[in-house]
């Protein structure tokens, strides 16, 4: 059956890195909308427009022919997730939640800060907003754990924070240089007499 995957987790917990490994998924992400359309990681002045674009894109993706649709967002609140469960059912999809770790909190916050620094260093056109600890802590306080009675067919749990974040590219693996065999070449006798 076609799936509607809802990623659930704090910033830096590995949601984007997870979905980037799923190349055939149709993914809708507020972060991608903010960055690609508005050139910001977060800007309150454009959040209404981000929300309208995001909501439309989620509905379009759910109605598409894609086998798996994924919502890559925080999805920390039960009422946000219930809207996705309902949309999944209306569009004939199986709702699945993938929950990412939020502990250890200090390590997770450091990872987010590292990701933002890397993003700032790698993109000259993108305005990277600060992400203060009190905003992060407020997100943590409002987080409502995913419960089986929410209507998800499956609730999957990722156990570890990402080693490589959704922003950080893995280190390239050095390749061994191949050497060609040097064989003595003999001319082909085309006009042998």
Where are the model-predicted features located?
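Conserved GTP-binding G-domain of TRAFAC-class P-loop NTPases and closely related GTPase folds
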Residues: 2-8, 13-16, 21-24, 102-193
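A structure-centric signal for secondary-structure junctions around beta-strands
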Residues: 1-2, 94
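Solvent-exposed, flexible loop/coil residues
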Residues: 37, 42, 46, 80, ...
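Conserved substrate/cofactor phosphate-moiety recognition/catalytic segment
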Residues: 13-68, 105-106
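Glycine-rich phosphate-binding loop used to anchor ATP phosphates in small-molecule kinases
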Residues: 46-102
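Short, glycine/charged-enriched secondary-structure capping and boundary segments
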Residues: 21-22, 42-44, 83-86, 111-114
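Short, surface-exposed, polar/charged, turn-prone segments marking secondary-structure boundaries
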Residues: 34-36, 55-57, 97-99, 124-129
